[in-house]
């Protein structure tokens, strides 16, 4: 299997499968996928370029903050959006509010807004990052 074939295979995985893959790799190689924490504060002048980069951002992550009173309805919408199975969608919805409760990652602004609209219509709450 070439690296290109491996990348294509990974692209075809669901969010739940990717999370499981990361967990397996962490266990197998004894590493952590957590980002290192910056020890020093950034310089004041460095804030301006990051603000400009945020305006040009073309890839967004949709994070589930809460499922509200209609958990079952939110699960149905999450399944529709992600293509996850019932158990995986339920597990994702039950993680609402966690730092890794992403419905979708790396989507365009229009798609992120559409996901937010669908989830809020059934009583859920999302954050677009």
Swiss-Prot record:
GO CC term, one of those recorded: cytosolic large ribosomal subunit
Keywords assigned by UniProt, alphabetized: Ribonucleoprotein, Ribosomal protein
Nucleotide-binding found in the keyword field: no
Family annotation (Gene3D superfamilies): 3.30.1390.10, Single helix bin (1.20.5.710)
Gene Ontology biological process: translation
CDD domains: Ribosomal_L7_L12
InterPro entries xrefs: Ribosomal_bL12 (IPR000206), Ribosomal_bL12_C (IPR013823), Ribosomal_bL12_C/ClpS-like (IPR014719), Ribosomal_bL12_oligo (IPR008932), Ribosomal_bL12_oligo_N_sf (IPR036235)
Entry's Gene Ontology molecular function annotations: mRNA binding; structural constituent of ribosome
Coiled coil (residue ranges): none
Superkingdom, natural source: Bacteria
Record note on quaternary structure: Homodimer. Part of the ribosomal stalk of the 50S ribosomal subunit. Forms a multimeric L10(L12)X complex, where L10 forms an elongated spine to which 2 to 4 L12 dimers bind in a sequential fashion. Binds GTP-bound translation factors.
Described purpose of this protein according to its UniProt entry: Forms part of the ribosomal stalk which helps the ribosome interact with GTP-bound translation factors. Is thus essential for accurate translation.
Family the entry assigns: Belongs to the bacterial ribosomal protein bL12 family.
The protein's name: Large ribosomal subunit protein bL12
Gene responsible for this protein: rplL
């Amino acid at each position: 299997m070439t690296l290109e074939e491996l990348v294509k295979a990974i692209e075809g995985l669901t969010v739940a499968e990717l999370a499981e893959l990361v967990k397996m790799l962490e266990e197998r190689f004894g590493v952590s996928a957590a980002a290192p924490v910056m020890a020093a504060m950034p310089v004041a002048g460095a804030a301006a370029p990051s603000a400009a980069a945020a305006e040009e951002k073309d890839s967004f992550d949709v994070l589930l903050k809460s499922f509200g009173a209609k958990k079952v309805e939110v699960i149905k919408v999450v399944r529709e959006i992600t293509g996850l199975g019932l158990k995986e969608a339920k597990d994702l919805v039950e993680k609402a509010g966690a730092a890794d409760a992403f419905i979708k990652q790396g989507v365009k602004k229009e798609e992120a807004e559409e996901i937010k609209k669908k989830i809020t219509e059934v009583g859920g709450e999302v954050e677009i990052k």
